[in-house]
């Protein structure tokens, strides 16, 4: 496979209150033979992260075909694992649903942040997502005492498999 460097194809404009800075942690989802939806994480003026997407034709990647004006996934309620932000990291399509695995974070007093893994599901081809719970599906535990982050999920031979980063010392 030969890669062709295209450079920067998207910047947040700052026109949306939820997307003032950054278009980071991209997740690519192929819509048809040449159309792609690219999910990304952005920050608001309070440094909280939310998710949106834009769509391109791979043959004209600098031309934005569609862009969300509202976030598709937002920080959680006060006190939840994702109250400071959400960052999508893995997307799996299974039948008619899309499963978005994301890192939720909050800011405790003794360390800069605390990460856990959440799940949101779309039943409208990835245009919107709904969290399955206010709580994480994976968080610190006796084997992963410091943090869990960045899940990569696949559905293989009727099994869901997750690979993730663990903070060990």
Show where each model-derived region lies.
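Beta-rich carbohydrate-recognition and catalytic domains
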Residues: 1-84, 92-150, 154-169
């Amino acid at each position: 496979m030969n890669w062709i460097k295209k450079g920067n194809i998207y910047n947040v404009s700052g026109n949306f209150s939820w997307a003032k800075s950054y278009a980071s942690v991209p997740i690519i989802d192929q819509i048809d033979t040449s159309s792609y939806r690219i999910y990304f994480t952005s920050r608001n003026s309070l440094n909280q992260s939310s998710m949106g997407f834009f769509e391109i034709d791979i043959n004209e990647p600098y031309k934005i075909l569609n862009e969300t004006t509202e976030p598709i996934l937002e920080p959680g309620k006060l006190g939840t694992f994702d109250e400071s932000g959400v960052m999508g990291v893995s997307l799996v399509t299974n039948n008619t649903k899309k499963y978005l695995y994301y890192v939720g974070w909050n800011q405790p007093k003794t360390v800069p942040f605390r990460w856990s893994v959440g799940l949101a599901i779309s039943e409208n081809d990835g245009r919107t997502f709904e969290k399955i719970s206010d709580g994480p599906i994976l968080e610190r535990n006796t084997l992963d005492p410091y943090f869990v982050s960045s899940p990569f999920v696949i559905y293989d031979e009727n099994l869901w498999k997750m690979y993730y980063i663990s903070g060990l010392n």
